[in-house]
């Protein structure tokens, strides 16, 4: 389960907290507003002696889920999965609730390992107005992953990554259906095979990605594409 879970909660400020070894999403917020976290340390990959945790495969670090006005700053996250995953529910349940994640600010943070700051892939309520600014990514496989697979529905929009730097010398993860590169937008996330020319009807399960801005980004990486669209 989650190590910290906030649900239907507003006006929370957390500071100088260290959380480790969550078997699932580490710090998860759902249906919350006005959450601020300052100088938070999250580690779902290594213990305090540098030994790797075993058996953690979906250990997202920080996860606002159908939340608004969430602020994460001056924090360190080391993850075996997404360091940050902005979500808004999944499939029929997420579309029924229809609460987007919006007005998310992630600034002056340091991310180590994992897959950087992700939008989706659970995004049935929509994700919009997210800023990731002045962050460093060390041995992370990506800065930005925008995952909107067909079938999830809703829209990921007004997402900005600005003044971020990635240096990755870790070659343990190869390009796959789960990972494409340092900056990637993927409407076929998780699919083993797909035909981009195949017709699929447009409806409530059709996912949309639009208005994504990448500005002043530096990349040095050994695995995956630099940019994948």
Please provide the spans of the model-predicted regions.
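Extracellular/periplasmic carbohydrate-active domains that bind, remodel
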Residues: 1-229
């Amino acid at each position: 389960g989650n190590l910290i879970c906030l649900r239907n909660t507003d006006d929370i400020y957390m500071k100088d907290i260290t959380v480790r070894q969550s078997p699932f999403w580490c710090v998860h917020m759902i249906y919350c507003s006005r959450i601020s976290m300052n100088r938070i340390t999250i580690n779902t990959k290594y213990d305090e002696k540098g030994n790797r945790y075993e058996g953690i495969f979906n250990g997202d670090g920080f996860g606002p889920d159908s939340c608004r006005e969430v602020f994460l700053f001056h924090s360190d996250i080391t993850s075996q999965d997404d360091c940050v995953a902005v979500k808004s529910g999944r499939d029929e349940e997420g579309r029924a609730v229809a609460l987007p994640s919006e007005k998310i600010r992630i600034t002056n943070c340091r991310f180590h390992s994992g897959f950087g700051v992700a939008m989706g892939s659970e995004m049935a309520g929509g994700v919009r107005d997210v800023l990731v600014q002045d962050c460093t990514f060390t041995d992370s496989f990506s800065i930005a992953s925008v995952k909107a697979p067909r079938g999830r529905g809703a829209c990921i929009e007004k997402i900005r990554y600005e003044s971020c730097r990635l240096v990755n010398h870790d070659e343990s993860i190869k390009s796959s259906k789960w990972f494409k590169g340092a900056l990637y937008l993927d409407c076929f996330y998780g699919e083993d095979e797909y035909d981009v020319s195949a017709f699929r009807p447009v409806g409530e399960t059709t996912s949309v990605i639009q208005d994504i801005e990448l500005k002043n980004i530096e990349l040095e990486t050994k695995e995956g594409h630099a940019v994948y669209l």
